Amino acid sequence: MKILLTANDITIGGGVERVVCNLANAFDELGFNVEILSFYQKNEKCPYTLNPNITLTFFPNTRDIHTKEPLKRLFNKTIYRFFVAWKMRQMFKDKDAIIYNCYFFPYFKNKGTKYFKIHHQVFKRSWTFKNKLFDSNIILTTKQLALWQSKIKNVQIIPNFLTQIPNQNTNLSQKVVLSIGRMSKNDEKRFITLVEIWQSIQQEKSFQEWQLHLIGEGEGKAAIEEKIKALNLQDSITLKPFTKEVEKEYLSASIYAMTSKCEGFGMVLLEASSYGIPCMSFDILTGPSDIIEDSKSGFLVADNDLQTYAAKLKLLMHDETLRQAFGKRAKEIVKEKFSKAVIMRQWLTLLDCK
């Protein structure tokens, strides 16, 4: 079976791009003929490892769909998008399945090809008609399923997977809380909120030996640094850049704290859980509630309830036995629901291969 996976720009090293590469490698390992189509190429190489058999193709002369020039924007939203669909039909007549992870849609199709779309963001009403062009729409979490099904019939839930589940577990006696993510200008991960929560916790002497490690880069990093200084938390909060040796960071932590306002899925929660780390998150629209079992593997807190979040975090910090119990269940959930073998069986069923 010949499969094509698309990406906006496979070279930028984002979360979606990593998912595309992981899925491509998994299909290749199952014996499929796999190709990735990237519409853009900001950097010279893809930052993620691809198996040697996988073909990487860049779409010829793709225009910048994010241009601010009004006439170009109008052209890109109308004529050019149809041109891309027509060109793809010509280029990929031999594909049995095309799995979209991009802004483009299959306005023109080949009869022998099935078309799928993985939605890495929340439901967009403006895309309802265009999403009906796909044979199946794949969403990552259950929380939005009812909304999707009220608008579109062809919807499936297939989560992301971890390529490997580590044998090692963290030592949960370490007094470190960890949070990882891109530090964007609009603070989507709400690191500043986490800093404010941390300030309230540090008022109590029994928690002053604990450290908060924030790992990430981005335009919003300076604002986070300023907030830490303004609240005089330099001694208990450490900012670190992104690292390829992220395993060391997980193995140095006893709690993972997420405060995001939105998540496509929340791969960091999976990764932390795979090391036996109990996780905390606000119960936002998508993501965390599929990974965290509240009061069993971690805590889910009503969105924006900072007081309760702080109280639950203090409870975990205070009780190592609770951390051990939550961490054990967290790892079990990853094995049961998010291993590569489990998720690829779902893909094979969708593709009528099993």
Where are these regions (language model features)?
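N-terminal strand-loop element at the rim of the active site
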Residues: 5-13, 26-75, 218-220
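Nucleotide-activated donor-binding/catalytic signature segment of Leloir-type glycosyltransferases, i.e.
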Residues: 225-241
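Conserved acidic donor-binding segment of nucleotide-sugar-dependent glycosyltransferases
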Residues: 293-295, 299-307, 315-321
